[in-house]
């Protein structure tokens, strides 16, 4: 499972002219389920995301998490994170999970986030979204959780 995490002062997602998700200070999380991902990868990614220390402490060091600062999470599905352009100029998205699997894993991830964090907003899976943000820093961190092999 892939995530592109951006520290923001504020962010919002608009679908068909209506705001469907909005946060103030916090993390904008672009999320992509890859082929082979399960709920386990989503759980591991969520734990990492909530503990990711990319907010400044009193000394100005990145030493605080979104939980520490009471920030929001805005989670937006983005299958294009699985793009592979190594074979030419047109990217392939074959590494992304099938749409039905992607939707299921996205919904499980958002539900899990809402169970563990007080302020969680989301985009709309599969919609044409406009994402507005004020980047803070900028700080952008890619995260990837690879499926663990099952014992034989």
UniProtKB/Swiss-Prot annotation:
SUPFAM superfamilies: DTD-like. Keywords: Cytoplasm, Hydrolase, RNA-binding, tRNA-binding. It comes from the Bacteria. GO terms for biological process: D-amino acid catabolic process. Disulfide bonds: none annotated. Its main location: cytoplasm. GO terms for molecular function: D-tyrosyl-tRNA(Tyr) deacylase activity; Gly-tRNA(Ala) deacylase activity; Ser(Gly)-tRNA(Ala) hydrolase activity; tRNA binding. The keyword Glycoprotein does not apply. This is D-aminoacyl-tRNA deacylase. It comes from Aromatoleum aromaticum (strain DSM 19018 / LMG 30748 / EbN1) (Azoarcus sp. (strain EbN1)).
